[in-house]
C-alpha cells in the first residue's frame, strides 16, 4: 500500500510511475479522498478540543458563581456530546474510503523496469545451458506419466474435478525428492531458515501480502471454522504465511536480512485462461512449491533481489535444466511487485518443438507489503521504519517435476533420475514401468 503523504508531496512523480503500468493517473482522486479525511479529522478534533475546554470552563464558572455561564457551557457540552459520534463516524468512513482506494492500486515499478503492455514486452536477462537434443520426438509429461501408470488425471477428476492430478509410485516419490532437494539446498547452502507454516490464514494475512481485496475471486475460501465463525483462506503461496510472520512487529535491523523458506501445498482458484494448458500438470488448482521470502532494510533489498534470483537458479542448475531469466515489463508485473524476474525452464514436450515455461518468479516489493502489515525495523538511530519484503519461488515443485520428466525422458518412455536426486530416491537411476 502506498504512503498518502508521499503522494501529496509529489503527485506528479507518483502518477508518472503509476502510468508506466498502463493505468490512468490516480493521484488527484486519492488526494481528494485524503482531503475529505483530513477535514473530517480536523472537525472531530476541534469538537473534542472545544468539549474539553468547555468542561474546564464549567468548573471556572461555578467557582466564580456565574451560574448563567455554567448552564450555557453545560448545554454546549451536551450538544457536543450529541454531535461528536457523527463526527467520529465521518472520520471512520473517510479513513475506510481512503484505505480501500489505496489497497486496490498496485505497486510502482522501479525506474529500470522495461515498459510494455504484456508478456511480449518482457526482456531476456540471461540464460543457462543449452536445449537438449534427442534422437526421437520428445513427448509431453502427461503422455509419459500416464504410460508409466504413475500419473492419473481421471482418478483426480473423480475426486476433485478438473485441474488436479494423482501421482503414484516413482513419480510421487520423484516429486517428493525434488521438494526435499530444493529445501536442503536453500537451508544448507543459501542460509534460509525452514518454516512449516499454517495453510489456512485469516483475512488480515491475505490483505498484508495483497491477495485481498483485489484478488478475492482468485482464492479458495475455507468458510467459517469454529464457534467464532471467522472465515479462513487456503494459501495461494507460502509467501502469505512467511511474510506475515513479521506483521505488526518491529525488528532489530542487526537481524536483517531475515531469510525464510517453506515447502507447502498451494491452492489457486484461477488456474489460467480458459482453454489454456487444459492437459497435464502445468496449471493446477493444487500444487506444491518451495517459497523463498526475505525481510530486509531498504538499503539491502536490491542486492537481496539478485541473491534470491541466484538461489532459485542454483537448484535448476544442479538439476541440469536449461532455462532463461526474463525481466518482466511494467504491464506483466505482479500487483505487489516493484520489479520481477521470471525463470522460464525449457520443456521439450510442450507445444510444437518445446517451449519455455515459468517455474519461478522472484520479486522485490519495497515497503508496499510492509505498510499493509505494519512491519517495521529499528536501526542504530532508534527510529522505526518500514522493512522491505521480497518473495520468490525456489521453485515450483510440480513444474520442476514436469521439467525433469520431459528433459530426462528416454526413447522407451522411462525417466532417467538426475544425479542429485538419486540419493533421495534410494539410489534409483531410472523410473520405468513395472
Swiss-Prot record:
Coiled coil region boundaries: none
Protein name, per record: Serine--tRNA ligase
InterPro entries: aa-tRNA-synt_IIb (IPR002314), aa-tRNA-synth_II (IPR006195), aa-tRNA-synth_II/BPL/LPL (IPR045864), Ser-tRNA-ligase_type_1 (IPR002317), Ser-tRNA-synth_1_N (IPR015866), SerRS_1_N_sf (IPR042103), SerRS_core (IPR033729), tRNA-bd_arm (IPR010978)
Enzyme kind, highest EC tier: ligase
Main location: cytoplasm
Record text on subunit structure and interactions: Homodimer. The tRNA molecule binds across the dimer.
One MF annotation (Gene Ontology) recorded for this entry: ATP binding
Gene source species: Rhodopseudomonas palustris (strain TIE-1)
Pathway(s): Aminoacyl-tRNA biosynthesis; selenocysteinyl-tRNA(Sec) biosynthesis; L-seryl-tRNA(Sec) from L-serine and tRNA(Sec): step 1/1
